[in-house]
From Swiss-Prot:
Name assigned to this protein: Uncharacterized protein YahJ
Family classification: Belongs to the metallo-dependent hydrolases superfamily.
Cross-referenced PANTHER family: BLL3847 PROTEIN, CYTOSINE DEAMINASE
InterPro entries attached to this UniProt entry: Amidohydro_3, Metal-dep_hydrolase_composite, Metal_Hydrolase, Metallo-hydrolase_Enzymes, TAT_signal
Modification(s) after translation: Exported by the Tat system. The position of the signal peptide cleavage has not been experimentally proven. Can also be exported by the Sec system.
GO MF term list: hydrolase activity, acting on carbon-nitrogen (but not peptide) bonds, in cyclic amidines
Signal peptide: 1-33
Pfam families reported for this sequence: Amidohydro_3
Length: 460
């Protein structure tokens, strides 16, 4: 693994500031009118397909691998027609075969179909994105407590723009192929429930083309900011997950903070998704305490996500294996931004052991970090650079991180996606195969969510 290690070392040196930030927190062709389809163009040049039942021709689909000496060296593909009805893929057909000649048909232009990508850790409710460029000077030695104080001053300035900028962020995500997300949303005394209400209003408007879970996030400390009553109100108001934050370094009482977080989840039958940045032994202790809590509480099985979990980078291989085995049994997941600084997260080791590993943007141009791109294909590319030897099969496998484990081909090179009755949620990519898409972060040309074209265009 010398190639991978040297690449990781290089990225580590060039990416230290990215991890420090994480510790705190194509042009599209104009649409053509289809003869049989009902189309119109939105102001942002996104074509709108209003037909509930149609054919999409000239779709490039992966069909298998070609092997040399037992190693995949090339991905086989074929152009096919995909029949879509009521948000589902109902059939894969020979290209341009239309059994029902009365149905509208569109043309994907030979672009590669890949599963929709998923941004499973983002903050849609607080961002500079969509407004004027802005970066903040954060001196060396700035602590998370300093950032909390800064945020308490800034949140009232950001709130008037919450809905407008959340809409812009969703546009950005869709342009990168993402239609499924999980957003953390500030719940603390400064914001109250305003951010939640604003985000829910945006998601209600965008629900036809964008699915998003909401984590009620006590950004200023669950205990420190005395946010438990607000968190309970957020659960009653429809938040899907109970959030948490650094129970030792912020709240100063690890067990009490985690017990409070879990109790809220149990009282309202919700999941848990906690920000855990701590890299001291307290971070390892918090992870072990959470795993033990889930082991003792069957109602929490499959309901815990640990975001960031930087403390895992301080464990040796055997310790990670032992913890991963317990996490698999309890269906505990990890959400990581794939940090590239001095901390080398054991993401591949966790994934290989069967732990569900997800990724996300985290911040997109805000007071925590200016670097977020909103591109899950870029995250898969970064994962590949850090963790694998770059061959055809390994590159194609790395796509799992972007798509929530949905891949066109299985390990044997057999097609497993798309198939009949799958959601018609996918992205068209200007690439010859998923390996190329990961390696080159290939341009996206159209994004579909449950049969609806939500970004980009196809031809008629």
């Amino acid at each position: 693994m010398k190639e991978s290690n040297s690449r990781r070392e290089f990225l580590s040196q060039s990416g230290k500031m990215v991890t420090a930030a994480a510790l705190f927190g194509t042009s599209v062709p104009l649409a053509h009118a289809a003869v049989a389809g009902t189309l119109n163009c939105e102001a942002n040049n996104t074509m709108k397909i209003t037909d509930p039942h149609y054919y999409l021709d000239n779709v490039l689909l992966e069909t298998g691998f070609d092997y040399e000496n037992g190693v995949a060296v090339q991905t086989r593909t074929a152009r096919q027609t995909v029949e879509i009805q009521d948000g589902k893929i109902v059939a894969l057909r020979e290209n341009k075969l239309h059994p029902d000649a009365t149905l509208p048909h569109y043309d994907a232009g030979g672009k590669l179909m890949l599963p929709t990508t998923r941004d499973m850790h983002i903050h849609l409710d607080k961002t500079f994105y969509g407004g004027p460029w802005r970066s903040l000077n954060r001196p060396a030695g700035t602590t998370i407590q300093d950032m909390i104080k800064l945020e308490q001053k800034m949140l009232p300035e950001l709130q008037p723009y919450t809905q407008e900028r959340a809409e812009k962020l969703i546009d950005l995500l869709q342009s990168k192929g993402t239609t499924i997300a999980r957003s953390h949303c500030n719940i603390e005394p400064v914001s109250g429930l305003k951010n939640l209400q604003n985000l829910q209003a945006v998601l209600a408007r965008r629900q036809a083309g964008f699915e998003c879970e909401i984590v009620a996030f006590p950004q200023h400390g669950l205990l420190l900011s005395k946010s438990e009553p607000l968190m309970r109100e957020a659960m009653q108001a429809g938040a899907h997950y109970v959030g948490g934050l650094d129970p030792t370094s912020v709240d100063g009482a690890m067990e009490k903070s985690l017990d409070t977080m879990f109790q809220i989840a149990l009282d309202y039958d919700k999941g848990v998704d906690i920000h855990l940045h701590e890299t001291t032994p307290a971070g390892v202790a918090a992870i072990n305490y959470m795993v033990e809590t889930v082991e003792k509480t069957p109602q929490l099985k499959g309901k815990l996500t640990i975001s960031h979990a930087f403390a895992l980078a301080t464990l040796n291989e055997q310790q990670v294996d032992e913890l991963a085995n317990r996490m698999v049994v309890q269906q505990i997941s990890i959400a990581s931004t794939v940090p590239i600084g001095t901390l080398h997260m054991p993401l591949k080791q966790l994934h290989d052991k069967g732990v569900k590993v997800m990724t996300g943007t985290d911040s997109v141009i805000d007071h925590w970090s200016p670097y977020g791109l909103g591109d899950m294909l870029e995250k898969a590319n970064l994962y590949a650079q850090l963790y694998i030897r770059p061959n055809e099969q390994n590159l194609s496998r790395s796509l799992f991180l972007a798509t929530g484990d949905v891949l066109p081909l299985n390990e044997k090179g057999e097609r497993v996606w798309p198939k009949a009755q799958d959601d018609a949620s996918f992205v068209l990519v200007d690439a010859s195969c998923s390996a190329e898409a990961v390696a080159r972060i290939s341009p996206r040309t159209a994004t579909f969510h449950k049969g609806q074209l939500v970004w980009g265009s196809v031809a008629g």
